Amino acid sequence: MALLDEVKSELSNIDGGSPAVQKAQVTSMLYFGRGFRKVQRESSTQIIVQPQFDSMEAAHWLQETIESLYKIPAALKSVDVKTPQGSMRRYAVDVGARAGFALAVRTGMIDPRLNRIVRGLPTDLSNGNIAQIKGVWRGAFMSAGVLSDPDKPSALEIICPNEETADSLIAMGQRLGIRAAKHTVRSSVRVHLSDPDAIERLLTMMGASSTVRDWTGKRPDTESHHRANRLANFDDANMRRSAKAAAEAVVKVQHAFDVLGDDIPQNLRAAGQLRIDHPDFSLEELGRAARPQISKDAVAGRIRRLLQRAEKAEQDAAMA
């Protein structure tokens, strides 16, 4: 099995998480699977939902999730597509015309007030939490992701249906601390990453922790290999100390959440949640992942105030 297929297979077997995260991934796969179009039939316009994938496991995940999450029947079909390289087997998830409009509205792909297609990703996903953002990227990669072989120059690309969707995906990547670029190849709009460390982090955040080790471990650049696996190798003393400090910070933040419950200002809660979601991020990377972005000093200050608040609450409780 090719490494790209292994990545998509691993992502397809991840527990979908909360309904909000599953919805984010379903919506992303419908967009990047290019399965949404309007068709004029007689006197009415029908919505056809039939995304196609090169991975049968990805298509099967989408079929099962549409049926379980939205209670809408979906059929899995194989389709032979003619390409310049010859015939290619694809896998389509067919929702059918009757349920297509309902699914499009519920996933935010169409504005029911204007009966108009939303060209970029829906706003509720762009403004969603970190878990939803990861779900969007996971769905995009499962649908239209390309990954270079380990012996080739590092590259990860997402083939996008339009400019607006590419812009939305890039903005979401920034919230994960990932900087991606947009470019066009033969009229195809793509979101592109070339930094091997960024690719390794993104694949890990999407959930491909096993296959990303294969991708990184087979790279001929030994220095890049060790850098990309800094948390697993612990050969360098500075890296070991940084990883230990980050792990301790996660434990302290989680304890503060348990102590304070709902009595936490939103800005302090958001900073603490960023540390829990990204235990291997530097303070600068956490600041870039915040929305809106903040400085590393602001992140450090908010986490410090959160811990101080929890410590004071424990002291007050002990004296009561």
From Swiss-Prot:
Pfam families: HTH_WhiA (PF02650), LAGLIDADG_WhiA (PF14527). Disulfide bonds: none annotated. InterPro entries: Homing_endonucl (IPR027434), Sporulation_regulator_WhiA (IPR003802), Sporulation_regulator_WhiA_C (IPR023054), WhiA_LAGLIDADG_dom (IPR039518). It comes from the Bacteria. Keywords: Cell cycle, Cell division, DNA-binding. GO terms for molecular function: DNA binding. Residues 282-315 bind DNA. One of its GO terms (biological process) is cell division. PANTHER family: CELL DIVISION PROTEIN WHIA-RELATED. Belongs to the WhiA family. HAMAP family: HTH_type_WhiA (MF_01420). Involved in cell division and chromosome segregation. This is Probable cell division protein WhiA. It comes from Bifidobacterium animalis subsp. lactis (strain AD011).
